[in-house]
């Protein structure tokens, strides 16, 4: 069963890569007990590729858990505030650095 969090970004967007990296780092810090599946570069033929490639700003698809994994879903449901803070920290770090 798939487990962990991952961040998908446009493979030709340096700013998207940086944003995905900052988000991944904030999630790894906030949830050390969860598995990081890392960053995934998308192209136009990948599922989600159109979304991250057709925007006019850096875009990242954040997947904190797999919907098919009830244990991970329940974990993040019980830690919504920490989840929101991890998103905010990652975005803030991207904006100021």
What are these regions (language model features)?
Residues 35-39:
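Short beta-strand elements
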Residues 40-97:
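Active-site-adjacent mobile loop/cap segments within catalytic or ligand-binding domains
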Residues 1, 12-15, 33-34, 44-48, ...:
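Solvent-exposed loop/turn segments at secondary-structure junctions
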Residues 1-30:
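A short, glycine/acidic-enriched catalytic loop
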Residues 22-33, 90-97:
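Structured segments of extracytoplasmic/periplasmic soluble domains
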């Amino acid at each position: 069963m798939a487990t962990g969090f991952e961040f998908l970004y446009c493979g030709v967007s340096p700013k998207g890569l940086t944003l995905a990296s900052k988000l991944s780092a904030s999630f790894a810090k906030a949830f050390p007990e969860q598995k990081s599946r890392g960053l995934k570069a998308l192209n136009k033929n990948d599922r989600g590729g159109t979304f991250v490639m057709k925007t006019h700003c850096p875009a990242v698809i954040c997947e904190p858990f797999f919907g098919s994994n009830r244990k991970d879903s329940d974990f993040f449901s019980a830690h919504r505030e920490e989840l929101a803070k991890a998103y905010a920290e990652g975005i803030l770090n991207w904006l100021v650095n």
